[in-house]
Amino acid sequence: MQETLLEFFKKTGRPHRLEEILHRFGLEKREAKAHLKALVARGLLEKKGSRYFLANRVQGPLSLHRDGYGFVRLPEGDLFVPPGYTGDAWPGDLVEARVMPPGRDGRPWGVVERVLKRARERLVGTLDFRKGRALLLPDEPNLPELPLAPEGLEGLKRGSRIVVQVHYGKRPYGTFLAYLGEGEAPETETEAVIAKYGLRAEFPEEVLKEAEAIPLEIPEAELRRREDFRGLRVFTIDGVDAKDFDDAIHVERLPGGYRIGVHIADVSHYVKEGSLLDQEAFLRGTSVYLPGRVLPMLPERLSNGVCSLRPGEDRLVLSVLVDLTEDLKVKRVRFREGVIRSVARLTYTEVEAFAEGFGLPEEHAFLAEDLRLLLDLTQRMREKRLKEGALDFAFPEVKVEVGEEGELHLIPQAEPKARSLIEELMLLANRLVAEYLVQKGLPGLFRVHEEPVQDAYEKLRQALARLGYTLPPKLSGHALQKALLASRGRPEEPVVAYLVLRS
């Protein structure tokens, strides 16, 4: 009945007296008052005098400033919450706030009335002791110091990095869960990141057992069922320190054109829907790359074993075979379950050196012609995309390496031609797969970059004008690309790229 009453208030959009409710719904006075009182207690209705009306409340995540004020993040615009009105909420908590009448500045403001969902159950921080009491100094900014229960802290020193379980209430406190290390050593920071985001560092025993049960040899019947690409010069290009190789490529010259093959490791053959491996991969979502450490989505037997396209070993793949004309128009596309035997494992460094005019290592010299052709084709593909209005953001990529003594090194990734080769081929394959899914009405996950709305574009025009770049009044992809290219090598290049990306 309460939901029915609530819908009635929403539909009419005005206050109602108790007598109106009694007449409209034919309720007993005691029953009606009980339902209305419950709705008031739930924060859904308010009572003023003899009238009941919908509570003017909003829900959203709370951001807090160190000075005590905050904002409830809302799609229609953030709601300001003054100091002293944030309740017991912490940054990131999902809260319900009452919207108050506009103040002197003419803007409404809010009062946090309750926390709907906490943003965190655990905290990572540094252990401290004061006046005989243990405290956690959280890593996250704007979080309060948290008193700790003494259990589990025996033998730990001030400055230890730990993980605690947070117990909310009038007087929040934490209980010890795990010791991460001392100070700010890189390995301690890595453990802190794993703990903070709840990453799954280890595989459950039953998942590992399921992985171990997967045979290393491919059954003969499975090989016969698939298209055989083992006679082609299929190879991989990856980073120097890559451990798993999940995509491979090949190219062939055809009369009047070319054939490009993009071969992706067929993980779905080994990870069956609903299996323990599938469930664990679902929980992980992705492999996580940390400095000096990888948390793979699948156990090593798969990620570095049967699903890694290593040279000289038969591997199952899903392949996209694209026939192109001389001017790079798609003439024919085939999707196949296949088997490959990679002939080489190249690195971005080797391919970049080759693109700059140096030779390939002797053992890979037989791929020189294929590589030369692929570099030419993918360069032309890229130029074609840019002519059609695609945007090219030249954000530098940086790799983080950890030295033997724990020192961090930031190493720019400087293999633009080699990486562009792979990027163009993956873009081609993904676009053709997406077109196939749309044509067949099949469900799929699409990554879409929407065009800027005119208001955002106008703000971008004004911002770039202050930097000396002119954009036309009407949105134009070519004009945006022209501005990006004009800023290359100039001090404002990252600012221009960032503004265009944010628009």
Residue ranges of predicted features:
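A sequence-level detector of short linear motifs
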Residues: 80-81, 332, 409-410
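Conserved catalytic alpha/beta cores of large enzymes that bind or transform nucleotide phosphates
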Residues: 288-387
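Short, well-ordered loop/turn elements at secondary-structure boundaries
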Residues: 230-231, 244-245, 253-258, 284, ...
